[in-house]
Amino acid sequence: MSNIIKALEQEQMKQDLPQFAPGDTVVVQVKVKEGDRERLQAFEGIVIAIRNRGLHSAFTVRKISNGEGVERTFQTHSPVVDSIEVKRRGAVRRAKLYYLRDLSGKAARIKEKLAKK
């Protein structure tokens, strides 16, 4: 029984997702339906948490909009998420960056990860 469920979940999972980690700055293209038409809306911010649960995986992105912190959680394999693009890699030493909620301005910046040679 569980093999059938795993096979169905594997079939529904997206295969073309980029590798990203907490601290990375990403642009998530989200499908937004307005009336009878559909358009893409970009949400750019820092990944503060990732939840890996197969088909039920999710990640949280935080950005500052008009001086106000905005967090949005996306289901990784959702059909609403059109694409994910990694803008820059962040060098962090935590899996969950919830401490960024208390920081503002320059204190909330994350160093860029240097490429390995």
Curated annotation (Swiss-Prot):
Please give the Pfam families that the UniProt record associates with this protein.
Answer: Ribosomal_L19
Its GO biological process annotations read: translation
Might you report a single GO cellular component term?
cytosolic large ribosomal subunit
Give one GO molecular function term. structural constituent of ribosome
Q: Which domain of life is it from?
A: Bacteria
Q: Which InterPro entries match?
A: Ribosomal_bL19, Ribosomal_bL19_CS, Ribosomal_bL19_sf, Translation_prot_SH3-like_sf
- Signal peptide boundaries: none
Keyword annotations for this protein, in alphabetical order, are: Ribonucleoprotein, Ribosomal protein
Role of this protein = This protein is located at the 30S-50S ribosomal subunit interface and may play a role in the structure and function of the aminoacyl-tRNA binding site.
HAMAP family for this protein: Ribosomal_bL19
Task: Write out the similarity annotation.
Answer: Belongs to the bacterial ribosomal protein bL19 family.
Q: What is this protein called?
A: Large ribosomal subunit protein bL19
Q: Species name for this entry?
A: Vibrio cholerae serotype O1 (strain ATCC 39315 / El Tor Inaba N16961)
Gene this chain is encoded by: rplS
